[in-house]
């Protein structure tokens, strides 16, 4: 993981912690993890980097939000409201690019109890530098899907048949990746159509697959934004928001022509992709993890007396204690400062 590599490179120590089942499964291979909130308290970290919406306020550490993903547009109003909701737990928000930085900085000026640093998103560090891919007579298409049934192409029988037919024709090669929460019976249907030109990949490590493919076919999956950072076109099937940086279709019959259009890499489309990604995530140096850690050190070491105390948030704090099974009156509402 890019952030872990950066932390170790600096000679610092890192421990992982998750209290929810999905997080625990993701960390099951980790030897450097804390298994209980009591262990976290004893560990006494200087910095907590979180992708979750809340964080235990009773741990005295600098609390930093690094985000789980880009702002998506599956359900625009809901996503936007959730992405920019300030819950009063964090001292620092490490934003990904101008499109989110501007909003968080406006909120910071208004609320005055957190800082904002535009760092880029550490998860995509391995994507850079962008490697130029040689074009082949049989281009490779990455198929990616979200797990919400009404938004997902993975459940669509006609889409499955079309991809199967196109792969068997030899015109395209396909690499299929489905969201891990998609039911096993749906995944099995995709596994069953595998052939020399179509492979299903059971992985959540998408960046190597991004690099192996020429274009993407997707629905509303959040992988779209990450893929576009390569300046490679994306065809979307029944995406619910119109975007000029996507090739968007509604009908299965249009899949082949849309893929061919995307493979032309039309100038107007690449221009729109570039404009979008410069707002989303302009950093292409693979150094976002370093910027995150620099921002943490900066806030740890500078005078933060100008910052207000974080809000009481009594109901949210109670819910955290109930979830973790620990009840304490401790609550640290100002940025942590290590003893020098």
Show where each model-derived region lies.
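A donor-sugar binding/catalytic signature common to diverse glycosyltransferases
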Residues: 53-67, 203-246
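Conserved catalytic-core segment of nucleotide-activated headgroup transferases in glycan assembly
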Residues: 3-8, 116-190, 284, 290
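C-terminal amphipathic helix plus adjacent low-complexity
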Residues: 257, 263-340
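Short, hydrophobic beta-strand segments that form beta-sheet elements in well-ordered domains
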Residues: 13-19, 45-51, 93, 174-182, ...
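Catalytic binding pocket for nucleotide-activated donors in carbohydrate/polymer assembly enzymes
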Residues: 87, 113, 191, 222-284
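Donor nucleotide-activated moiety binding/catalytic core segment of transferases
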Residues: 34-41, 182-229
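Active-site regions of enzymes building and remodeling cell-envelope glycoconjugates
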Residues: 27-38, 60-69, 190-201, 232, ...
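Active-site and donor-binding regions of nucleotide-sugar-utilizing enzymes
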Residues: 1-128
């Amino acid at each position: 993981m890019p952030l872990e590599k950066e932390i170790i490179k600096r000679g610092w120590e890192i421990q992982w912690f998750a209290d929810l089942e999905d997080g625990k499964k993701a960390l099951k291979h980790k030897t450097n993890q804390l298994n209980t909130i009591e262990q976290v308290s004893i560990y006494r970290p200087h910095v907590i980097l979180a992708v979750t919406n809340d964080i235990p306020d009773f741990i005295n550490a600098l609390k930093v939000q690094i985000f789980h993903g880009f702002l998506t547009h599956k359900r625009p109003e809901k996503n936007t409201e959730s992405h920019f909701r300030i819950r009063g737990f964090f001292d620092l928000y490490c934003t990904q690019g101008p499109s989110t930085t501007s909003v968080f900085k406006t909120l910071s000026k208004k609320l005055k109890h957190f800082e904002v640093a535009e760092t880029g998103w550490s998860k995509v560090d391995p994507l850079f530098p962008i490697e130029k891919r040689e074009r082949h007579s049989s281009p490779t298409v990455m198929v990616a899907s979200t797990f919400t049934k009404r938004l997902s192409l993975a459940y669509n029988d006609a889409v499955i048949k079309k991809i199967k037919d196109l792969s068997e024709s030899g015109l395209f090669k396909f690499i299929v990746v489905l969201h891990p929460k998609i039911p096993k019976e749906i995944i099995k249907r995709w596994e069953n159509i595998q052939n020399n030109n179509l492979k299903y990949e059971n992985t959540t490590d998408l960046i190597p697959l991004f690099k192996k493919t020429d274009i993407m076919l997707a629905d509303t999956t959040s992988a779209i934004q990450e893929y576009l950072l390569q300046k490679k076109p994306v065809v979307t099937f029944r995406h619910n928001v119109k975007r000029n940086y996507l090739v968007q279709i509604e009908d299965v019959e249009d899949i082949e022509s849309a893929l061919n259009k995307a493979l032309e890499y039309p100038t107007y489309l690449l221009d729109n992709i570039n404009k979008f990604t410069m707002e989303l995530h302009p950093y292409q140096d693979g150094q976002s993890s370093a910027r995150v850690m620099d921002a943490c050190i900066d806030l740890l070491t500078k005078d933060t007396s100008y910052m207000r105390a974080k809000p009481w948030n009594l109901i949210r704090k109670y819910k955290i204690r109930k979830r973790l099974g620990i009840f304490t009156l401790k609550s640290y509402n100002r940025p942590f400062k290590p003893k020098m």
